[in-house]
Amino acid sequence: AEAARNRKRCPATAALLGSMPAASDMAERGVGECTFSALHGGAHLLPHCGSTNARLTAHLPLIVPDGCEIRVGDEVRQYREGELLIFDDSYEHEVWNRHPTDVRVVLLIRFWHPDIAPAKYAATKRAMRRAVVRHRRNTCLPPLDVSLTPPS
């Protein structure tokens, strides 16, 4: 229901996503998304990694004040309105909006890696869900204090 409401709110974006089977399929399977990503002035998304290399991520910059950039691996790129960036988010990446006040907005689209055949999407989805659980367990749970572990 929410997806249908969002398609009505953003018909041009919905049409764009509909024209990209590798993106719409991933979103419909619940392992990808198409969303507007806003980053407030002065914000920094700390270094992080996605959970899988079975997908790629596209950023289409829509509103870009001065001082907005992304680092993927060792490469830093400036955001420029209308200039598409595609990257594998399983590599460490971080984002800055160094403008003191203005918001940066990108259309973020995740889509199947082109090396994965459509016939493999269902099996890959299952593997991705398992990888996400492991990734969250490894990155979101605090490490166990050694003093709390039972003696062996």
Give names to the regions the model predicted.
Residues E92-L107:
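Ligand-binding loop in jelly-roll beta-barrel domains
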